[in-house]
Regions:
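C-lobe/activation-segment region of protein kinase-like
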Residues: 177-258
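Juxta-kinase regulatory segment immediately upstream of eukaryotic protein kinase catalytic domains
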Residues: 1-54, 248-252
Length: 258
């Protein structure tokens, strides 16, 4: 079920996605107007998640993500839930703009009160990507390069003063595309008001604890835990490039020509 033009989105099964979880006719009309303002011509209901009988790309506490089509092509559209803990998508849009300014995250294409339109990223979540390539001959090199890319992006977010907020548990927040480029997603809880700790948070997820750290250590070897903890504490006190390079070295992510 794909490429549904805006004129057909008033059908109940689609309307209940656009106004999830509480459908109201007036709210649907408002949101369809917002879609037109963003230049959206149609939505495409595909993905691994389901709401009723309709497939979607993602479902979270703040919004539902679906594929959208504009005159410029395919995009990702995040639709604010009617029961979300916020009244507008403005904050997330502003946080994504800051991330974009340091070449992190999908490109922001536009937003309204209830909608966030972004560049569509075709790829796999990091854990699934690693499991897919794990038996390939160049798996070690590819995994190391992607991990280095992720840490460099987190470093740029730290320098920008933007804390993502959810990278210590990030299985759903990093996608790897077909060109082995990593993309950090979901800036809904990001903030410039708290201390940015993206490098330390992502290192906990990738190298220090949990299934992801176990998966990675089985491919590239285990980072020295005590040494890495000390280096992360040092970086937290003084987030210099020199201290960051020491973290890369401890995680076996240097000498990759990235």
């Amino acid at each position: 079920m794909c490429m549904i033009p805006l004129s057909k989105l008033s059908e109940e099964k689609y309307a209940r996605i656009i106004c999830y979880p509480k459908y109201e006719r007036e709210e649907l009309t408002k949101r369809l107007c917002e879609m037109r303002r963003l230049g959206i011509k149609a939505l495409c209901f595909v993905g691994d998640k389901k709401i009723g009988e309709v497939s979607v790309l993602g479902k979270g506490y703040v919004g539902i993500v679906v594929s959208a089509y504009t005159e410029k092509g395919k995009a990702a559209l995040k639709i604010r839930r009617t029961d979300a803990d916020r009244k507008t998508m403005k904050h997330e849009a502003e946080m994504l703009q800051i991330a974009n300014s340091v070449n992190v995250g999908p490109r922001l294409l536009g937003f309204t009160q209830d909608l966030l339109l972004m560049e569509f990223i075709e790829g796999l979540l990091l854990p699934a990507w690693i499991k897919k390539i794990i038996e390939e001959r160049d798996a070690v090199k590819r995994v190391r390069r992607v991990l280095r890319d992720i840490l460099e992006q987190c470093r740029r977010l730290d320098e920008a003063g933007l804390d993502h907020g959810e990278l210590s548990k990030a299985p759903k927040h990093v996608i790897v595309d077909r060109g082995d480029k990593a993309w950090i997603l979901d800036f809904e809880t990001a903030s410039t008001m708290r201390r940015a700790s993206n490098v330390t948070s992502i290192c906990q997820f990738l190298f220090l604890k949990g299934r992801m750290a176990e998966l990675i250590s089985g491919i590239i070897g285990q980072a020295p835990q005590d040494d890495l903890l000390l280096l992360l504490k040092k970086y937290k006190r003084s987030p210099t490039r020199e201290n960051f390079e020491k973290i890369l070295e401890a995680c076996a992510l240097t000498g990759l020509n990235c």
